[in-house]
Amino acid sequence: MPKVEVYRSILLGKIGKDLTDCELVSILEMAKAEICEFYTGNDKIKIEFNDTNRPDLWSYTGLARQIKTYLFGQLPSFEFFSTADNLQKFYGEILVSPEAFSIRPFIFGFLAKGMICNEQMLETLIQLQEKLCHNYGQKRKRVAMGMYSSASIEFPVSYVTCNSDYRFIPLGMDIEMSIKEINKRHPKGIEYASILEHFTEYPLLLDYNDKVLSYPPVINSHDIGALKVGDTDLFIEVTGTNLEATLLSLSVVACDLHDMGFEILPVKTVFPKETPFGKEIICPYYFQNTLEVSVESVNRMFGSNFTVNDMCLDLKKLGISAYFKELDKFYIIPPVYRNDFLHEVDVIEEIMIGRGLDSFKPELPKDFTLGKLSQIEEFSRKIKNLMIGMGFQEMIYNYLGSRTDFIEKMNIKSDEFLSVANPMTEGYEYVRGSIVPDLLKSESISSNFPYPHKIFEIGKVALKDLSSVDGTMTYDNLAFLMADKEFSFNEINSLVSSLFYYLNIEFKLRESSQTLYINGRGADILINDIILGSFGEVSPYILSNFGIMVPCCVLEINLNKILH
């Protein structure tokens, strides 16, 4: 979970109220945070957040904004945001080339002026940058941020691509290096170049005079890519692979700089093709949608009889605007710096926090039950021990993923897959119907580790099933992957035989027609003429979709069918 360091005196000064340590500890519960360390000899404290969905809190300005709103009920206002119906005046442009759009498509920025950047501001911005990129940005893969002194930049800025021989002086060095050299020798290149390892061209940010700003998401340039104490005019840009995550990250930084006293000047990004928010987007940009909430659902969840007005006042403490047109429902307007409302349950949680956890009296359970492991759980644990004994490493994945990974890269149809109605990001669009895509994704980022690779997971998958009450069916599956240039159908066939031998289960094989496998090198597993799963050598086409260069064999079987 993210941890941030803040100066206690600056935080309280920004809140506008002197709080004791006990009072501060108590009120931080509202932000799902706790003080994990008081530094002796200085004014710093370290705060740990128990939620990764609130990047707006990962700085003293964002945290102070939330506490101030909670204590005094004043909704913050940011007039510099554009909306679909109200576009702000822009003070610079970012021009995106088709080539850059195909690699790392989204880039947005803004200018900030009017304050002298002091040491504490710079420390706060660098810390926010690190937390945004590492936690929310998935180690820069989804989102990365760059900060510059705009005094050295001539607009418009161009977001283009270059080959691996392109040379510039990267931040932290005093000599020119090629992109290839940066990737292999620069500390940041060693750490982050793998994000772009499947591309032959690389993103580059240039100003109007072709001066290099950065090689995103890896490293800024030495000349104008370093922010220093004393800088007054700033240019902030965020690149990413997810549109809403990139926009939100930029919004968070813009709100923080505004709260520090900077004037925020919007910048327009011009894309080579349409995006869900248009071909031209002036940022910071408010893109969040209102969410409808049922009053009955709230009261049923709490066992209460709150009025709509009560609920709106509770939400206001969290910075959330709400209005109602009907007595039985109301609508929330997310703050510009938040995008974590997927379902009305998320709003109900905010009402609970705004009202105060102490206002709800705990009740002891009225029923008594005895618990024990289910049959499928006992069976799964037995198989897990067998897999570990055969040299496999266990993996644990999310049940949600992207259409790209689950469907497109696997070269299958989406007919049986369950899609999420209101996905927060593109990475959570579908419920997985197979574990194999997750295993292949892990293998795609493991090429630097010694072979052979042997990984497995026992987990749940879900598919459409019109015969069930809710139209879906959830199964417990085992899947494993073996990767090495020496592995073939014979090796995985031997492992499958060993697994079923130790389970004392007889089975039959027949050739599989799945496009996942090389023709003639895949087999379905049958017991009593019922297909339990399949295994085989993965097709080179699918391996190339995941960027895997080493032969892989996979197996996936339905454990529920084995039991029943």
Swiss-Prot record:
Belongs to the phenylalanyl-tRNA synthetase beta subunit family. Type 2 subfamily. Pfam families: B5, tRNA_synthFbeta. Its cofactor is Mg(2+). Its EC number is 6.1.1.20. InterPro entries: aa-tRNA-synth_II/BPL/LPL, B3/B4_tRNA-bd, DNA-bd_dom_put_sf, Phe-tRNA-ligase_IIc_bsu, Phe-tRNA-synth_IIc_bsu_arc_euk, Phe-tRNA_synthase-like_B3/B4, Phe_tRNA_ligase_beta2_arc, PheRS_beta_core. Keywords: Aminoacyl-tRNA synthetase, ATP-binding, Cytoplasm, Ligase, Magnesium, Metal-binding, Nucleotide-binding, Protein biosynthesis. One of its GO terms (cellular component) is phenylalanine-tRNA ligase complex. This is Phenylalanine--tRNA ligase beta subunit. It catalyses: tRNA(Phe) + L-phenylalanine + ATP = L-phenylalanyl-tRNA(Phe) + AMP + diphosphate + H(+). It is found in: Cytoplasm.
